[in-house]
Swiss-Prot record:
Protein name: UDP-N-acetylmuramate--L-alanine ligase
Origin species: Wigglesworthia glossinidia brevipalpis
Pathway info: Cell wall biogenesis; peptidoglycan biosynthesis
Function according to Swiss-Prot or TrEMBL: Cell wall formation.
GO terms of molecular function: ATP binding; UDP-N-acetylmuramate-L-alanine ligase activity
Organism superkingdom: Bacteria
Length: 475
């Protein structure tokens, strides 16, 4: 890959990433290191990503400070970073360009064969499956996504071919920077409405614009099961390929079976009049849809069937996407006999919660379900409050942690205590407010008993709870 070519495009050698410890930012920084750029970055917490980047040669700062950017010629910012960040303020004073991650990535992809995945749910899983198939097909893609493959530190890599595969985030409308050859939309729901003046119609209009960003020779891959996608299809004047359980889909899932370890499903390929059977370690109908989106692209792009089939079968999954571990010993926690099953899931939108709860109940029917939930963002909790109440009332015992702010300011009356009270009013679940970690572990000591299912759900610091809990309970 010609580093000089990219230098001419970006006119920059020293790139600084604000919020470099995030998965998406870290993956992009790693790719830039491999392209030959001098990389620095700041994040308030050291993690596995910043450690890896440091080993690769990046200069990492564990605080945000104006001095961090003195040698930088371009500043790349995460969508989680606010305008009042010291480094951003100082960069603007020095007339150093400050660009969003999506804008920067879109420039790298400008002359490449881009495949971009968007949608409210399933972006990371779908993107990682597409990337995995392309790797197995020896197409050597560049790829990056917002998660980490299980049993590895793989969340992005620089390839040496024309293919660039990434997910795109609609949270701040920055997905409109991309001009891919192939675009994917998995679904459209109310989320990130704070970026759209609380107006769902404006969010849908942005998705329509995104789908029109492909060239005349490109195409979009859309899930026909999604109500909102079906509504906007007549408004799209570009080539469309559909997938889903819907019988009118171009790639139609005709049969689906799930055990507690895998899913088996059959896809009918309309233009080939052919049925293909797939087996995956991922669970749930929603994952059958994510997989079928990837299958659609792979078949359309001419990848051999046996490579696709084997890739789907081998795909290890993404960290914290319905990870579960059976037989955790209770004796180390509360001196009780027996074991429990622990499920860890990243989902933080009520639809994601609903799907996870449904999958848990289907796999472990009649077992008591105890759920720890950490709401993510005040704005999401505000706009989807009633939906959260409805979904969260379906578990046996619910423990709700404080809202993870993700940098947002508190909103009056939007808090976990009030959410608990609203759920308790339905009188369906036993609900407990969790003010801190110490209180949580004390409650778990009292509550957990043999054969329970413990579900940890959320995108914030709850991941650390899972690590501490499993270190105590693992047989």
């Amino acid at each position: 890959m010609n580093n000089l070519f990219f230098s001419k495009i970006l006119r920059s050698d020293n790139i600084h990433f604000v919020g470099i410890g995030g998965v998406g930012m870290g993956a992009l920084a790693e790719i830039c290191i491999k392209l030959g750029y001098k990389i620095s970055g700041s994040d308030i917490k050291e993690n596995l990503i910043t450690k890896k980047l440091s080993v690769l040669g990046a200069k990492i700062y564990n605080q945000h400070c104006a001095n961090n950017i003195i040698e930088s010629t371009i500043i790349v910012v995460s969508s989680a970073i606010k305008e009042d960040n010291l480094e951003i303020i100082y960069a603007k004073k020095l007339n150093i360009p400050v660009v969003k991650r999506a804008e920067f990535l879109s420039e790298l992809m400008r002359f490449k064969y881009g495949i971009i995945v968007s949608g409210t749910h399933g972006k990371t899983t779908t993107t990682s499956i597409i990337s995995y198939i392309y790797k197995e097909a020896k197409l050597f893609p560049t790829y990056l996504y917002g998660g980490r493959l299980n049993n590895s530190d793989d969340y992005g890599n620089l390839g040496n071919s024309k293919y660039w595969i990434s997910e795109a985030d609609e949270s701040d409308n920055s997905f409109l920077f991309f001009r891919p050859i192939i675009s994917v939309v998995t679904n459209i729901e109310k989320d990130h409405l704070e970026s759209y003046q609380g107006n769902f119609k404006k969010l849908k209009e942005s998705f329509i614009k995104f789908l029109h960003n492909i060239p005349f020779y490109g195409y979009s891959v859309l899930c026909l099961d999604d109500i909102e996608i079906k509504k906007i299809i007549p408004l799209i004047n570009k080539k469309i390929v559909t997938y889903g359980f819907n019988r009118n889909s171009d790639f139609c899932i005709t049969k689906f079976f799930q055990s507690n370890k895998k899913i088996i499903f059959i896809v009918y390929i309309k233009h080939q009049k052919r049925y293909l059977k797939f087996v995956s370690n991922l669970l749930g109908k929603h994952n059958a849809l994510n997989i079928t989106a990837a299958i659609t692209i792979a078949i359309k792009e001419g990848i051999k069937y046996n490579i696709i089939l084997n890739s789907i079968k081998k795909f290890p999954g993404i960290n914290r996407r319905f990870d579960f571990i059976n037989k955790y010993d209770l004796s180390n926690l509360n001196n009780k006999k027996g074991t429990i099953t622990i499920v860890d899931d990243y989902g933080h939108h009520p639809t994601e919660l609903k799907l996870t709860i449904k999958s848990v109940k289907k796999i472990w029917n009649k077992r008591r379900l105890i759920m720890i939930f950490q709401p993510h963002k005040y704005t999401r909790t505000k706009y989807l409050y009633n939906y959260f109440v409805k979904v969260l009332s379906t578990v046996d015992i619910l423990l709700i942690m404080e809202i993870y702010s993700a940098g947002e300011n508190p909103i009056y009356k939007i808090n976990s205590k009030n959410l608990c009270q609203s759920i308790m009013a339905l009188k369906r679940s036993h609900v407990i407010f969790i003010p801190n970690e110490k209180f949580l572990f004390k409650k778990l000591e009292l509550l957990l008993k043999n054969n329970d299912i413990l579900l940890l759900q959320g995108a914030g610091t709850i991941e650390n709870i899972f690590k501490k809990l499993t270190s105590k309970l693992l047989l």
